[in-house]
Swiss-Prot record:
The keyword Cytoplasm applies. Belongs to the eukaryotic ribosomal protein eL24 family. It comes from Schizosaccharomyces pombe (strain 972 / ATCC 24843). This is Large ribosomal subunit protein eL24A. Signal peptide: none annotated. There are 2 genes for eL24 in S.pombe. Pfam families: Ribosomal_L24e. The keyword Amino-acid biosynthesis does not apply. It is found in: Cytoplasm.
Length: 149
């Protein structure tokens, strides 16, 4: 037994029941009753008539308890190592006491300051040396110029 579906209302049309409508372009429409056929021919929208299956499907009527709620994925945080520090090193630093961490920070800061001061003094020495040589060159030029006059 082949059960058809109404082209308008979406309800089942059993063999020997319902009406058949063939349009000019040979498209076949099956209707469960005269009411569905009449509304189809009046070009009514089945989604706006509350008794049709299409309306019920569109407005989520009757089948809501059948579907389980859609689950959303939860984000899970993971601890991972980064370049230059693996996970063990990171955990070790995190578990250090604040005083130890502050002392290490102060030592690193002092080391950086010392290094910067050393490089600056080196630059000053180079600058003084170049200034002295240029001053000597200038003095020689001045002496030659005085000798000419």
């Amino acid at each position: 037994m082949k059960v058809e579906v109404c082209s308008f209302s979406g309800s089942k049309v059993y063999p020997g029941a319902g009406r058949l409508f063939v349009r000019g372009d040979n498209k076949v429409f099956r209707f469960v009753n005269k009411k569905s056929e009449s509304l189809f021919l009046q070009r009514k929208n089945p989604r706006r008539l509350s008794w049709t299956v299409l309306y019920r499907r569109m407005h989520k009527k009757g089948i809501s308890e059948e579907h389980a709620k859609k689950r959303t994925r939860r984000t899970v945080k993971h601890q991972r190592g980064i370049v230059g520090a693996n996970l063990d090193v990171i955990k070790e630093k995190r578990n250090q006491r604040p005083e130890v961490r502050a002392a290490a920070r102060a030592a690193a800061l002092k080391q950086r300051k010392d290094k910067k001061a050393a490089s600056e003094s080196e630059k000053k020495a180079i600058k003084a040396k170049s200034a002295a040589s240029s001053a000597r060159g200038q003095a020689i030029k001045n002496a030659k110029a005085a000798a000419r006059h």
